[in-house]
Amino acid sequence: MTFTRRHFIQTSSALAGASGLGLLPAAAKPLSFRFGYSAISWGTDIEEAIKVGQRVGLPGIEPFRQNVVNYLDKPLALKKLMTDAGLQMVTCSNGGGPDFSGNFFDPAQTPKTIADHVKFARDFIKPFGYCDHFKMNNGPRPKGYEVSDDQIKVCADALNAIGMETIKMGIKLAPHPHVGSLIQTEHETRKLMELTDPRYVWLTADTSHLTLGGMDPIQIIKDYWPRLAEVHYKDAPRHLRGGKVLAVPKTGPEAGGHGWFRNLNDADGGGVDFPTLQKYLIAQNYKGWCVLDLDASMIPKGSNMEEVLKGNIKYMVDVLHVDPKTV
């Protein structure tokens, strides 16, 4: 029997009891990959984000640059806070601050973009000593919205230049297709992967953003498996499964996906086939991170991110039959 979202909602009470009694089936063997969560919704209060992660028990945390601005010159102090809480930094995403260039399509601006990203990887990510990749978004779309192949080539050249330097640090550069950004559709994603050098550029596959961009996230992961650095677990509305067109509007706050993201346990989720994805990652002996990339737009009224994380973790235990806190 297929365990659907509706079945999950209807039987959650019974499963909660079974889980508490240790009656749920365990994974056949320890997983080769680990789970983390995003710190994006805590702003600069990275200390509170760490405390929440410690309480819910996830082993990895993924901040953005804007989350760690108070630690840019003291990464080892932040590493100690994480270590003391039993956490490891998965990676740190780019972005944040007027001093940091995120333009990947204008040849006049990409030299600073390249320099800023190499410096951030060298001065902040590398000192952690164990981060093997640099997840990054690719900045805004150009004025007029449409993106040409020539502009994707400018982006690819910049990524190749950054990746050529970060790989010397033992860090794989892993761009993240993201609705509302320079790289959001299937054509743009595949063109970028075609134009980037696999020796220097990998991929962060966000299941929700790929779905909202009109892609099948499992197919994208399969097609670029040798270059997969990280997976973001985040759902989308059920009716978008199998869709082939961009789902989000071109302008406004929803252009970046806000209002379209779904938690794994949301009743109207199901745009992503997580049971099939999980089985594939296990079969392929995936050795990276899977991150619950949840943001403030996904918090129901009257709740908070800690409770949201607990709900997503419960779905993973009850439906995917894995406790992300223990792997």
For the regions a language model picked out, list residue spans one by one.
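Histidine-acidic metal/acid-base catalytic patches
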Residues: 2-23, 29-35, 47-54, 186-201, ...
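Acidic-and-aromatic substrate-binding clefts and catalytic sites of carbohydrate-active enzymes
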Residues: 40-46, 64-75, 98-102, 113, ...
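Hydrophobic faces of well-ordered beta-strands that scaffold small-molecule active sites
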Residues: 33-38, 61-63, 89-94, 132-136, ...
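N-terminal small/glycine-rich loop or linker at the start of catalytic domains
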Residues: 29-34, 94-102, 138-142
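Acidic (Asp/Glu)-rich catalytic clusters
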Residues: 30, 50-55, 72-92, 119-130, ...
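Active-site acidic/histidine proton-transfer and metal-coordination neighborhood
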Residues: 12-21, 27, 104-203, 304-306, ...
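Short, basic, helix/turn surface patches
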Residues: 86-97, 116-126, 202-208, 260-263, ...
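N-terminal targeting signals for Sec/Tat export/insertion, comprising classic cleavable signal peptides
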Residues: 40-60
